[in-house]
């Protein structure tokens, strides 16, 4: 079959659509946010492809797989086995790294196990087991006539008189021994000091180097090796300063005897006990109770709350501190940072062996006196964290925990033996720390010889191929040791994309969700080449995408619309890019053809030089001591290639500092910096990201934006409610009273099907309405609470027109383009872009102070050109109220409308971390060193054709 045929697709908001999609082509599905793109690509095509494959497995195998719901579709023909590569499934496992996800680490383990050279950690001597023949050949190759002696070490650096050993050696017929470097007669050995370390080496043979000595030497070596347990030393008899020859029959260091078991791949795995560092169990970090987090307000007194939970409000712990104060004679009301350092140490780390008289007063007022050392606040927390069975206590204490690099393995995760195996004078941790780009050139330039080259050939090919794929999807700046949980959604998705190309499958349907997220325009071309390569292998590649370059590169485009939510779900246009541009109903086509565009502001808002936010000396991750200057009250854009340091500078440094100083947060530790100036211009900082507004089906736009509370109050105020004595709580589906108890206010009941997907059936009692019959009998303007929650925002705005507080909040949801979602729509069904706009609307609806610092990280993710236009209008509205907006963005439509741009670079990873240029878009566009400028300049020169 040449096509995938879809008939009657009705998943979510799709309106019974029919499609013929060409196979083995690059297909882009585009349209407004919430129009039904993911419903078609993921919830229909991928879900059915995966379901059909899984149904071919046995019932036993199916119970171990997470199954997707059967899509609401009449018929699909021509499907291949499907693989989805989404942004959501980033691993939160601290053991996952870029190297393990891509399987490069597995090949590196194999490489080091097969061609690695182990060395002694203390003496840097290669560990190698030698045969007696090799030892003999080495000695005979010395200059002829040289006088040598063969020694067998029997005692190495051990305390004692060793009388018995010396007597035994003499009894066995040995005449001489070298004791602590001096050769002496065993018939009259020196008296050794008991408390000193001694080395005793028996003289097994003395000889002049000659060619005919081979037989005699072989026998002597065998005797020496048997005596010493596998090591032998050959020393010059005439000149003690000549370097000695060390031999070992074991896989061991000939100097100290350090030995290793045979190299095997599991020794290089930090997820295996054989290779993991025993101190940190292969995590590379150790958790500890951080005094900086525990001491939240060192300028306060212990009584006044310097340590949360230990002040006078917590009687039990406070009386312990009072007893401590009496013992050490310090004032418990004095600021903590003014106390003597020894007292501070005792409070935090304990009194050591000092016993203190503690007075304990029970509930009845009886006093008990006990004497014991004080364990210290930090040790007390650590003990409670380990011993408690309460998840609430553990969660509370976890707030005071920080991570530090493991002291034993220096964060490399591997045990000592694995860290001292070398390939081309480089260890596995050193290779893992290289950026992917540098690692690729390291392996391309690797010169192995002989048998080692033959063994490594196939392994190196696999490593090289996988590194190339990662470079091709724009991830050359990441290191193989980078933890998976620190990756952005776009990075994680592109890593999995590279892994799929490495797998080399053919005849598969790949479904991708915006792979261009987090990717600079410079790297976009390489990503598209990768997708085309995947297609050329013989696969159908379906991409949900808004990026203009991706749409233009597609073989077939499907435009879903015309609007979003209930106004979408139809195929507006499909075919080639030209077909889309020619379709009058297609919004996408209008933006592609230039009939509509996002306008460049005629006049940019200029900065007030007296009001700036200045971050000085930021050095987190790859930042090279940069100073960031942002004008207050403007819309600023932070740009730069992927990995140049944007997130480190804004999220890890600026946001963390502002959160601590403005919002009083203590959880996040800012990345290193010297100084910050200008925070006095702000009263709070808000980060508006694309994380879900709630992780349970009970969370919805009405609860998140605060609309639900006044709605419940309205219902509680109607005469019927007053007569029945109903309070606003009666109209909540989260508490007993008004909700349906059969489904506990969910409206659906989950039925576990084990090897089939779990199904949710509407509750029989309330018919999916969430409330009991009595609650639903109460009507406001003829509608029950269930009917109000089922309204779209647009309908609700009209319905509550006479209630100003509600009308204002509903209007802001319409302003951000969410008129189509339902008030009670489950938060879990909202896309990332929709969740972000719900958050924006909540901010817009607040009575603003005009002194807020807003930080947004790639707000255009999942947004169509028309959605971006609407988002920019909202951001400009916030700016016009006096607020400061800082946006990390790659989208050129956003960048060109900014008042101020800060461009980082020039490259990613170690090649970045510098601020190349700051200024208006026009200033930045002239910077020769900037990759952003190269793409921004033509955008600023485009003549818009606005309609």
From Swiss-Prot:
ABC transporter domain sequence ranges: 310-587, 607-937
Keyword Zinc-finger set for record: yes
GO CC terms: cytoplasm; excinuclease repair complex
Stored Pfam families: UvrA_DNA-bind, UvrA_inter
InterPro entries, per the entry: ABC_transporter-like_ATP-bd, ABC_transporter-like_CS, ATP_grasp_subdomain_1, P-loop_NTPase, UvrA, UvrA_DNA-bd, UvrA_inter
Keyword DNA repair in annotation: yes
Binding site for ATP: 31-38, 640-647
Annotated compartments: Cytoplasm
PROSITE patterns cross-referenced by the UniProt entry: ABC_TRANSPORTER_1, ABC_TRANSPORTER_2
GO molecular function, one term: DNA binding
Single biological process term from Gene Ontology: SOS response
Main location: cytoplasm
Zinc finger (C4-type): 253-280, 740-766
Keywords: ATP-binding, Cytoplasm, DNA damage, DNA excision, DNA repair, DNA-binding, Excision nuclease, Metal-binding, Nucleotide-binding, Repeat, SOS response, Zinc, Zinc-finger
Family to which the UniProt record says this protein belongs: Belongs to the ABC transporter superfamily. UvrA family.
Record function comment: The UvrABC repair system catalyzes the recognition and processing of DNA lesions. UvrA is an ATPase and a DNA-binding protein. A damage recognition complex composed of 2 UvrA and 2 UvrB subunits scans DNA for abnormalities. When the presence of a lesion has been verified by UvrB, the UvrA molecules dissociate.
Subunit structure: Forms a heterotetramer with UvrB during the search for lesions.
Record's protein name: UvrABC system protein A
Organism: Yersinia pestis
Lineage: Bacteria, Pseudomonadati, Pseudomonadota, Gammaproteobacteria, Enterobacterales
Encoding gene (name): uvrA
